[in-house]
Amino acid sequence: MSNIYIQEPPTNGKVLLKTTAGDIDIELWSKEAPKACRNFIQLCLEAYYDNTIFHRVVPGFIVQGGDPTGTGSGGESIYGAPFKDEFHSRLRFNRRGLVAMANAGSHDNGSQFFFTLGRADELNNKHTIFGKVTGDTVYNMLRLSEVDIDDEERPHNPHKIKSCEVLFNPFDDIIPREIKRPKKEKPEEEVKKLKPKGTKNFSLLSFGEEAEEEEEEVNRVSQSMKGKSKSSHDLLKDDPHLSSVPVVESEKGDAAGDLDDGGEGESAEHDEYIDGDEKNLMRERIAKKLKKDTSANVKSTGEGEVEKKSVNRSEELRKEARQLKRELLAAKQKKVENAAKPAEKRSEEEEATPDGAVAEYRREKQKYEALRKQQSKKGTSREDQTLALLNQFKSKLTQAIAETPENDIPETEVEDDEGWMSHVLQFEDKSRKVKDASMQDSDTFEIYDPRNPVNKRRREESKKLMREKKERR
């Protein structure tokens, strides 16, 4: 791979494509393909490729884009016509990450370009290579091909170029053109005029008269309240749950305060003027307060009944809990009484049992339980006790071996607890009865040393014999 990079000529120019798959750095061969590089850089400066999609994806082969129409048949060069191919002997389709011009034939280059996803020797001398993808951005380029495609090699959710940035421009004389892009036409749904509202035919309904009256009332209220904020006070005038007292004090009260400050004569006239209105308002307030008090009393009585029911329920639950506690305590007491029975009664019951095996089992069990209780559970005392048992076993073993001499060991197997201590382990002798007379020992090996003088004399004698035989012949 390093050999390939050495063969390629140095680059002169750099462009950054910002795509939905990530940024892609492209270095350009502006000396080897000047027309293609100038075309590509100027289109990037003119934002020609912005928001264009990669309309063709062939997995393992190429990813093609650069068509503003997104169909694969659009796009034009900066020269106003297709420009010629530019081939170079050191630029080959021998790896991934190369950028080349797409065309429909020879000398038919426009604005479309493609990235190679692998080796493509069949494209040599057919498409102009003008750049390469550099750095880790090659992995973003490979992500462009990770889409689902249809039978015509078109992706279902294509990636697109968000914007282009020219990092190094080798052509100082490029002047971007002002391209007038056609405005996008509005969709047909927005162009369509709104349909006129249909009239309601209430005669078709069984309750048509009532519905028609309600509709007229709603229309009348909506027309009267048009352009104003509406609340429940505006629509529900006869609702007893709504208060007639305004949240914000009326301006009359403020005016009354101002008149009081003005003088006594004016205040007296004002009091006489508003006396009748205030009385009416007070009467209405008192009547409504009485209604609220009665409704509050009804609610309080209902809440009191609910509280009584909840109290009764809680008392019942407490009683049940107390009863359960008593039952648990009684069960515990019975267990303690059963465990505290005298040992004499248990021994009498055991003696009364006719089965001797069961009685023996119980005696053994009691014996080992007593021994277990005597043992300490943990600590240094438990360790000392274990070492004492080990020493006791060792002394018992040595005593059994010393008491039984080798000649007095019986051949029969001993099944008692101490018989195995004096037993001697003996293996069967599998030696051969007939031995080779020439072999001193079966475990010895013959070692031949050529430096041994005996072996030297033997070799000389054998050589003499061989010479004599040859002379006789």
From Swiss-Prot:
Residues 11-166 form the PPIase cyclophilin-type domain. One of its GO terms (cellular component) is catalytic step 2 spliceosome. Its main location: nucleus. This is Spliceosome-associated protein CWC27 homolog. Residues 257-266, 405-419 have a biased composition (Acidic residues). GO terms for biological process: protein folding. It is found in: Nucleus. The modification N-acetylserine is found at S2. The keyword Nucleus applies. Keywords: Acetylation, Coiled coil, Nucleus, Phosphoprotein. Residues 206-230, 305-378 form a coiled coil. PANTHER family: PEPTIDYL-PROLYL CIS-TRANS ISOMERASE-RELATED, SPLICEOSOME-ASSOCIATED PROTEIN CWC27 HOMOLOG. Belongs to the cyclophilin-type PPIase family. The modification Phosphoserine is found at S347. It comes from the Eukaryota. Residues 177-193, 231-241, 267-287, 305-348, 360-372, 426-438, 458-473 have a biased composition (Basic and acidic residues). Residues 177-386, 399-473 are annotated as: Disordered. One of its GO terms (molecular function) is peptidyl-prolyl cis-trans isomerase activity.
